[in-house]
Amino acid sequence: MLKMESTQQMAVSIINSSFEAAVVAATSALENMGIEYDYQDIYSRVKNKFDFVMDDSGVKNNLIGKAITIDQALNNKFGSAIRNRNWLADTSRPAKLDEDVNKLRMMLSSKGIDQKMRVLNACFSVKRIPGKSSSIIKCTKLMRDKLERGEVEVDDSFVDEKMEVDTIDWKSRYEQLEQRFESLKSRVNEKYNNWVLKARKMNENMHSLQNVISQQQAHIAELQVYNNKLERDLQNKIGSLTSSIEWYLRSMELDPEIKADIEQQINSIDAINPLHAFDDLESVIRNLISDYDKLFLMFKGLIQRCNYQYSFGCE
């Protein structure tokens, strides 16, 4: 045995389940599109829109009303069921029509066409008079039925209102426009002057920066000249050094092969690049020290074979 309001409760449960399904569909669509969202924000937005559409379209009241009729029939109250006996003739056709009506109502509500606009459009129609700018407002059968049922009220506040004709003071309007123009002109001049000051300051900064760059370039040029002078001086010194060593070598009574070897090492010194020249000088000095060391060892061995002793220093 069903309770008194079991069908009505089932209808409310179906509406709530539809709302939850709408929330899940909205969040799933956002996730599939890769859009980040706030669940509470989506929930509140869908709830507000869902409640408005269901209430404004009359779908919620329609479903609950039918559920109440079924509950009354189940509880042996057949008055409402008898009034809707036409629904018992063929349930498939009324169900489809009712579904289409509810769908259209919700679609109109979602597009911003609310209940007031739908009722007014259903109660009135406008007929244009050919050749005139005026028109005739016609009442539909729905409006006539509402008048017969006493569902139309007259708001006297709109009837008693007096129409006031405003007189335009063109002089004051012109003065207002002139003040607005002067205010706009002063703001434009102020912005232009500020822009000129900024441009002038920027130009001064640019000239100052150009002067600094010019000074730095001049200083770099001086350093380059000084560096070239030092490089030439080093080249001359290296050339003089090699010439002096060659002259001194020729004055020595050494074996020609030794002289040729030393001259070859001296001629290998790079007189163009001072850095390479110092490396070459280091190599020549190392070779001379090595030759001197070998000569000393040979002389030491010769003295020892002759049973002589040697010592360093002066007595």
From Swiss-Prot:
Organism's domain of life? Viruses
- Signal peptide feature range: none
Q: Where is this region: Interaction with host EIF4G1?
A: 208-315
GO BP terms, alphabetized: regulation of translation
Its primary localisation, in coarse terms, equals host cell
Location of the region described as Interaction with host ZC3H7B in the Swiss-Prot/TrEMBL record: 170-234
Report keywords, A-Z.
Coiled coil, Host cytoplasm, Host-virus interaction, RNA-binding, Translation regulation
Q: Which residues form a coiled coil?
A: 166-237
Single Gene Ontology MF annotation: RNA binding
Q: Where in the cell is it found?
A: Host cytoplasm
Which region ranges are annotated with the description Dimerization?
150-206
Offer one Pfam family short name for this entry. Rota_NSP3
Q: Where is this region: RNA-binding?
A: 1-149
InterPro entries reported in the protein's UniProt record: NSP3_N_rotavirus, NSP3_sf, Rotavirus_NSP3
* UniProt record similarity statement: Belongs to the rotavirus NSP3 family.
Function, as annotated: Plays an important role in stimulating the translation of viral mRNAs. These mRNAs are capped but not polyadenylated, instead terminating in a conserved sequence 'GACC' at the 3' that is recognized by NSP3, which competes with host PABPC1 for EIF4G1 binding. The interaction between NSP3 and host EIF4G1 stabilizes the EIF4E-EIF4G1 interaction, thereby facilitating the initiation of capped mRNA translation.
Quaternary data: Homodimer. Interacts (via the coiled-coil region) with host ZC3H7B (via LD motif). Interacts with host EIF4G1.
Supply the name of the protein.
Answer: Non-structural protein 3
- Recorded source organism is Rotavirus A (strain RVA/SA11-4F/G3P6[1])
